[in-house]
A protein has these predicted regions:
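A short catalytic or substrate-binding loop motif that flags glycine-/basic-rich loops and adjacent residues
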Residues: 1, 20-23, 170, 183
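Alpha-helix-centered segments that form part of catalytic cores
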Residues: 1-10
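Conserved beta-strand positions that form and line the central face of beta-propeller blades
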Residues: 6, 18, 175
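Active-site/binding-pocket entry motifs
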Residues: 7, 44-45, 86-87, 129-133
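Hydrophobic helix-cap positions at the C-terminus of alpha-helices
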Residues: 7, 72-75, 158
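Conserved hydrophobic "DFG−1" position in protein kinase catalytic cores
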Residues: 8-9, 29-31, 166, 178
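Metallo-beta-lactamase
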Residues: 13-107
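C-terminal regulatory/interaction regions
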Residues: 111-183
Length: 183
């Protein structure tokens, strides 16, 4: 289904809205007349969706996701019908929470790089995770892998914004640092 396609389902019309980030081809379906958004994994009520976790990979998955969240805010507010979790009254309210979360995570990531943590793994270990503020070593293995992937995505956004630089080590690892001209 192409972005912007209206699907006439007799009793309602759903507009397909391309929202890459969780996956490259993710779509939400907005029913403006009924003020409902079928959000899939784009906006979840209690957790942040995993970003760019697919075999094809997308180095800029977080940038795409943040743009998709902004695009969601540009639509009229609607009840949120997510793929996981309860229906909530406002898509916009949850989108604003997700944007605030990622702003905070970007700041924490930048601070960790400022503190000398250079690889996505090192940065992930320097940050607390989940709403319970758990240390990296307290996470199960799958969550650790997801945390390193999320950290790499945040580092890529900081790189595009000019807040960090990236070099490749002789072993092929990505090494990030804050530019000298930046505090």
């Amino acid at each position: 289904v192409a972005d912007g396609t209206d699907l006439d389902l007799r009793t309602r019309t759903l507009r397909a809205v391309h929202t890459p980030g969780h996956t490259l081809g993710h779509l939400v379906y907005h029913d403006a007349a009924s003020e409902i958004m079928f959000a899939g994994d784009h906006v979840l009520p209690h957790i942040t969706p995993s970003i760019g976790f697919e075999p094809a990979g997308n180095r800029m998955a977080l940038r795409d996701y943040l743009s998709s969240l902004a695009r969601t805010l540009a639509l009229p507010d609607a009840r949120l019908l997510p793929a996981h979790g309860p229906v909530t009254g406002s898509t916009h309210e949850r989108v604003n929470e997700l944007l605030a979360h990622h702003d905070l995570r970007l700041a924490e990531t930048h601070q960790a790089v400022l503190g000398g943590h250079a690889t996505p793994f090192e940065v992930a270990k320097a940050i607390k995770w989940t709403r319970r503020q758990r240390l990296f070593d307290e996470l199960d293995l799958f969550s650790q892998v997801m945390s390193v992937n999320e950290t790499a995505a945040h580092l890529e956004v900081l790189l595009v914004r000019g807040q960090v630089t990236r070099e490749t080590s002789p072993t092929g690892a990505d090494l990030y640092q804050v530019p000298v001209s930046q505090p």
